[in-house]
């Protein structure tokens, strides 16, 4: 058997608000998906991202409860350069999303910032400081 990682799933309280956030990060999700109870998007490289409303999850797991306080999932989005980290952070916070950590130059050689998605999950934005390429293993 060849098992492989294939999907990142996020439980959401408000599908439309969550999808609007991830669209701003470049995830290709059709506008008509905002009212759906389950949505999936291809990320490339054989990976998918999925969102399920709390109600959808309870439909097959009636005792399910969202984890209190969020922050149980970390996602990281690579930016082309440090200026893009700053710009994306500014765009998201100006749109009303909660900034958790404003952009800073991290000791590990990256420009880094963290914005919380609508359900309280930290979403990292990063880019190399030294001009090194962004790629596998270069995130947090």
What is the meaning of each model-derived region?
Residues 98-104:
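Active-site/ligand-binding-proximal alpha/beta "capping" segment
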Residues 107-110:
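Short, small/polar residue-rich loop motifs at catalytic or cofactor-binding pockets
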Residues 1-6, 11-33, 43-98, 116-140:
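Glyoxalase I/VOC metalloenzyme domain signal
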Residues 34-35, 102:
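A short glycine-rich beta-strand->turn/loop micro-motif centered on a GG-aromatic cluster
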């Amino acid at each position: 058997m060849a098992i492989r990682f294939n999907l990142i799933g996020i439980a959401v309280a408000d599908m439309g608000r969550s999808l609007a956030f991830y669209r701003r990060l470049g995830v290709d999700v059709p506008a008509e998906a905002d009212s759906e109870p389950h949505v999936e998007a291809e990320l490339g490289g054989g990976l998918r991202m999925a969102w399920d409303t709390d109600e959808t999850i309870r439909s097959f797991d009636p005792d399910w409860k969202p984890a209190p306080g969020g922050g149980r999932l970390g996602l990281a989005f690579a930016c082309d350069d440090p200026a893009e980290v700053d710009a994306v952070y500014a765009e998201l916070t100006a749109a009303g999303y909660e900034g958790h950590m404003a952009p800073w130059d991290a000791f590990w050689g990256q420009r880094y910032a963290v914005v919380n998605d609508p359900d309280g999950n930290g979403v990292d934005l990063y880019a190399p400081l030294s001009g090194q390429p962004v790629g596998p293993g270069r995130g947090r």
